[in-house]
């Protein structure tokens, strides 16, 4: 199984990018949720604007689908500057980064997604650029090689990552501002779904938005993806209006339950409960029981279940929690 193939995956796909551009908030005033982050960024941005300086370099980290790219674009809009966007894997050579840096205007934003995947060679070029706004370039090869320094205009580097722990200490320490994005609560997601529906010209009730928000796993990207699928359902099966019952019927058809679990989430939990008496069960046995690769279980299926308290990893293996039994209306073995 590929994570992006799941409807409730937080990993972005091409369709997400196209629609997200149409509904993405442009300014902090339009940004819903992440209140502590927004409050701090409003102050930092206003202070930089008043001084006529570039904003300090900013690192944004957190799970996928929470709005890191959106926030980077908002920062550029609020500062009234241009933004150039790239990603860690794309910057293969030092020259790739140098080409971007030398084309920046004063106070512009350079946004690097998946910054934890920068190669060491590229990262070395980034250090003096971030600290001193200077670019060290090697001219020639072998004994005749020499280094020249180019002055760069002041700029803001915004790095985004889902794995802040994978960043090297020298790189992490060069960011003046570090912000972590948290999963969204149902109220904020309801507001996000309602706003997205308005942007797409859809008629949606509060109950309809709430129904989607509850099943979105705390992630706006999933909420917006579910909205698009419910839009299709409402268009074909109803009059196009999305209310609570229509949203619930669409989610049932798509096999996404009230907790945002899909078929594979439920299959894993029920395997632990029914086949292994709630656990503990080793990863090899669990993989064989549900017919999935071990890497898929560890990287795709388990994280959300563990985070929400439905599954535990212990030294002896995986165990279903009381919350997992309650979700399926089952009694734990010690209660029978």
UniProtKB/Swiss-Prot annotation:
EC number: 3.6.4.-
Single GO biological process annotation from the record: DNA recombination
CDD domains cross-referenced by the UniProt entry: AAA
Residues annotated for ATP binding in this entry: 23-24, 65, 68-70, 131-133, 174, 184, 221
Top enzyme category: hydrolase
Location in the cell: Cytoplasm
InterPro entries named in the record: AAA+_ATPase (IPR003593), AAA_lid_4 (IPR041445), DNA_helicase_Holl-junc_RuvB (IPR004605), P-loop_NTPase (IPR027417), RuvB-like_N (IPR008824), RuvB_C (IPR008823), WH-like_DNA-bd_sf (IPR036388), WH_DNA-bd_sf (IPR036390)
Region (Large ATPase domain (RuvB-L)): 4-184
Catalytic activity: ATP + H2O = ADP + phosphate + H(+)
Entries under Pfam families matching the protein: AAA_lid_4 (PF17864), RuvB_C (PF05491), RuvB_N (PF05496)
Head domain (RuvB-H), as annotated region: 258-336
Binding positions for DNA per the UniProt entry: 313, 318
Its job: The RuvA-RuvB-RuvC complex processes Holliday junction (HJ) DNA during genetic recombination and DNA repair, while the RuvA-RuvB complex plays an important role in the rescue of blocked DNA replication forks via replication fork reversal (RFR). RuvA specifically binds to HJ cruciform DNA, conferring on it an open structure. The RuvB hexamer acts as an ATP-dependent pump, pulling dsDNA into and through the RuvAB complex. RuvB forms 2 homohexamers on either side of HJ DNA bound by 1 or 2 RuvA tetramers; 4 subunits per hexamer contact DNA at a time.
Subunit structure: Homohexamer. Forms an RuvA(8)-RuvB(12)-Holliday junction (HJ) complex. HJ DNA is sandwiched between 2 RuvA tetramers; dsDNA enters through RuvA and exits via RuvB. An RuvB hexamer assembles on each DNA strand where it exits the tetramer. Each RuvB hexamer is contacted by two RuvA subunits (via domain III) on 2 adjacent RuvB subunits; this complex drives branch migration. In the full resolvosome a probable DNA-RuvA(4)-RuvB(12)-RuvC(2) complex forms which resolves the HJ.
HAMAP family noted in UniProt: DNA_HJ_migration_RuvB
Free-text domain note: Has 3 domains, the large (RuvB-L) and small ATPase (RuvB-S) domains and the C-terminal head (RuvB-H) domain. The head domain binds DNA, while the ATPase domains jointly bind ATP, ADP or are empty depending on the state of the subunit in the translocation cycle. During a single DNA translocation step the structure of each domain remains the same, but their relative positions change.
Name of this chain's protein: Holliday junction branch migration complex subunit RuvB
Organism expressing this protein natively: Aeromonas salmonicida (strain A449)
């Amino acid at each position: 199984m590929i994570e992006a193939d799941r409807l409730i995956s937080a990993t972005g796909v091409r369709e997400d990018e196209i629609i997200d551009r149409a509904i993405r908030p442009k300014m902090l005033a339009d940004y819903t949720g992440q209140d502590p982050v927004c409050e701090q960024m409003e102050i930092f941005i206003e202070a930089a604007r008043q001084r006529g300086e570039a904003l300090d370099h900013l690192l944004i980290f957190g799970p996928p689908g929470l709005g890191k790219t959106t926030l980077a674009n908002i920062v550029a809009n609020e500062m009234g500057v241009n933004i150039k966007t790239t990603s860690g894997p794309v910057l293969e050579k030092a020259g790739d980064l140098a080409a971007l840096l030398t084309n920046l205007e004063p106070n512009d934003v350079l946004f690097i997604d998946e910054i934890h995947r920068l190669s060491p060679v590229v990262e070395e070029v980034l250090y003096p650029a971030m600290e001193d706004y200077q670019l060290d370039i090697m001219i020639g090869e072998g004994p005749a090689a020499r280094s020249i320094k180019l002055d760069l205009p002041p700029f803001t580097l915004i790095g985004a990552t889902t794995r802040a722990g994978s960043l090297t200490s020298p790189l992490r320490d060069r960011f003046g501002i570090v912000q972590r994005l948290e999963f969204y609560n149902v109220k904020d997601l309801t507001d996000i779904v309602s706003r997205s529906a308005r942007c797409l010209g859809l008629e949606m009730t509060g109950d309809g938005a709430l129904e989607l928000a509850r099943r979105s796993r705390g992630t706006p990207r999933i909420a917006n993806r579910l909205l698009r699928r419910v839009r299709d359902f409402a268009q074909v099966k109803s009059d196009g209006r999305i209310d609570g019952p229509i949203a619930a019927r669409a989610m049932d058809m798509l096999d996404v339950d009230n907790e945002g679990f899909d078929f594979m989430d439920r299959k894993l939990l029920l395997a632990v409960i029914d086949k292994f008496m709630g656990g503990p069960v080793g990863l090899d046995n669990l993989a064989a029981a549900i017919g999935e690769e071990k890497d898929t279980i560890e990287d795709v299926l388990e994280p959300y279940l563990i985070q929400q308290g439905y599954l535990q990893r212990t030294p002896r293996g995986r165990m279903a929690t009381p919350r997992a039994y309650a979700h399926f209306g089952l009694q734990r073995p010690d209660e029978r």
